[in-house]
Every structure is written in C-alpha cells, then in structure tokens.
C-alpha cells in the first residue's frame, strides 16, 4: 500500500541549501546509504522538461532530462522534499516520474501503444497534493494493474496545471478503466477524468477522449 510506503520512513529534514539548477539540486539531497533501507518493488526515475524557452528548430522532447533514479523509500523522500514539487517550477515545465528504463516519450516501446488519464488542478496546493498521492501510490504498487502503468507527468502551466497518468496498452479498456477509477480514489477527485490514446494525440492535438470515469 502507498500509505505503508509513506509511513515506513518519515520524510527526512535536510539542511542542504536548495540549488536552482535541477541536477545540482538533486545532488544537494546528499542521499546516503542507511541501515535497513526500505527497497521498493522496482526502480523509478524522475525526469524534467522545460519548454518555456525552446531553441529554434529543436525537436519535441529535446529539452527532456533525466534527473535521478531511485529504489528506496529514503531516496524518494530526500528527492521529493528537496527538489521535486511541481509548484516550485516555472510555467511550461513538465515533471515526470516513470518506471526506470522507460522514457516519457510516445516513441518509447513501453509507451508507443498506450495512452493517458488526465486531471486538471485548481491550485498549486492541489497540484502538489495530487502529485504526492500519485507518487506514493506508484512506488507503493497500490494499483492492481501496476505493470500497465508507465508513469505520471505534472505539467505546470500559466493558466491551468494538470497531471497525466501514462499507461502501456490503450486498447485494454478493462485495465484502463480499473486504473482510472483507482486513480480518482487516490487523488480524491469527484469530477470526470478522461483517457486519450497517444496515437490519436499524434494525429490531432485536441484528441477526443476514448474512456472516462
């Protein structure tokens, strides 16, 4: 359970000064091996993408950067407390947590046939809360269809922030509906959320949703 993972080790209070650069900030976390680390079922990787100042002619995703891969609860809390809160980032920044070995791109073999559930956030505080609840659910293997999930993306925007939960097999409606219902429960959302296929999004920017819960 995600709650068990969260409770396993209290969030560490770090004295290291935050650095404005993402990689430097991750290093500032000063993660140290500890006695009796609480290992996760699988490794996870944080990614960062700032699209606020794209270079002319740059391909989509060219600013995507791998930030840190972790495999223990202790590492997770160090990283989250020190760096990885969406509200800390400027507009047009995308923040990702994906299974290690999977890149947050449509072209990745694990994502190519997938899609995403999307939810919008009414405030920065709400975004941070939903983000943290989702992270704990993922690393805590709280979803019955955990192997179907690639990761989650927090998109910080000027007008409206959003979270997107990426999955592997969009055509597997039963699995996607189960994931969608569970996610709504985890982030405590009552409004309808929608699921779109990556293939549809490639062809059409405002692709019509295929599923909703």
UniProtKB/Swiss-Prot annotation:
Disulfide bonds: 111-150
GO terms, molecular function: RNA 7-methylguanosine cap binding; translation initiation factor activity
The entry's keywords: Cytoplasm, Disulfide bond, Host-virus interaction, Initiation factor, Nucleus, Plant defense, Protein biosynthesis, RNA-binding, Translation regulation
Expressed in which tissues: Mostly expressed in leaves, flower buds, leaf buds and anthers, to a lower extent in roots, stems and green immature fruit, and, at low levels, in petals.
Protein task: Component of the protein complex eIF4F, which is involved in the recognition of the mRNA cap, ATP-dependent unwinding of 5'-terminal secondary structure and recruitment of mRNA to the ribosome. Recognizes and binds the 7-methylguanosine-containing mRNA cap during an early step in the initiation of protein synthesis and facilitates ribosome binding by inducing the unwinding of the mRNAs secondary structures. Key component of recessive resistance to potyviruses such as the plum pox virus (PPV) strain D. (Microbial infection) Susceptibility host factor required for viral infection by recruiting viral RNAs to the host ribosomal complex via an interaction with viral genome-linked protein (VPg).
PANTHER family according to UniProt: EUKARYOTIC TRANSLATION INITIATION FACTOR 4E RELATED (PTHR11960), EUKARYOTIC TRANSLATION INITIATION FACTOR ISOFORM 4E-2 (PTHR11960:SF60)
Subunit structure, as described in the record: EIF4F is a multi-subunit complex, the composition of which varies with external and internal environmental conditions. It is composed of at least EIF4A, EIF4E and EIF4G. EIF4E is also known to interact with other partners. In higher plants two isoforms of EIF4F have been identified, named isoform EIF4F and isoform EIF(iso)4F. Isoform EIF4F has subunits p220 and p26, whereas isoform EIF(iso)4F has subunits p82 and p28. (Microbial infection) Interacts with potyvirus viral genome-linked protein (VPg) of plum pox virus (PPV) strain D both in nucleus and cytoplasm; this interaction is possible in susceptible hosts but is impaired in resistant plants.
Family named by the database record: Belongs to the eukaryotic initiation factor 4E family.
The name this protein goes by in its record: Eukaryotic translation initiation factor isoform 4E
Species per Swiss-Prot/TrEMBL record: Prunus domestica (Garden plum)
UniProt lineage: Eukaryota, Viridiplantae, Streptophyta, Embryophyta, Tracheophyta
